[in-house]
C-alpha cells in the first residue's frame, strides 16, 4: 500500500528552495541541482511538482506571496499616521537582506514572464496588486479614483525602483531616505482628519 502524502512536505520544500535560491538565479533551477543542494532525491521534486515548469511556477507563487500579509491590511480604514506606519512596515520587510533577495527573484520571474508573453503572469501581477492596495487608501480618503490610481502607480513604481536601486547599488540607506520622502509625498495628498 502506498504511503500517505505528507501535506506539510511541499511547503517545507518550497521554503528550502527559496532559501537556496536567495543567492542564485531562477535559470539554475532543475530537479537535479535542487536535489543535490537540498540532499533529497529528484523523485521528491517530481512527486510534489510534476515537472520543471510547475516547480518554477510554484517558486514564483511563493516569492510573490511573501507580501500577502501586507496586502491584506484593510488600508481604507487607516488614517494618515497609521497608513504611514503601514508603509514603513512595508519598507522594513522588503529592505531586509531576505526581502531584497526575494525581490530580485520576483524581478527575474517578471522578466521571464514578459519574454514568454505571459501577460497574466504571477510576478507581473505583483505591481498591480500594490497599485490597487495604495489606490484603495487614497480613494477611501477622498482622492478621486482616477487620480488615486495614478498617484498609487507613481508611488509603487518608486517602491519597486528603490528596491531595485538597493539591490544593484547595495546602498540601502540612500534608498530608505528616498522611500521615506516618497511616503511623505503620497500621504500629503490626503488632508489631515
Where in this protein do the model-derived segments appear?
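Amphipathic alpha-helical packing segments from all-alpha helical-bundle domains
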Residues: 68-74, 97-107, 115-142, 153, ...
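Amphipathic C-terminal alpha-helical segment
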Residues: 96, 112, 156-173, 186-193
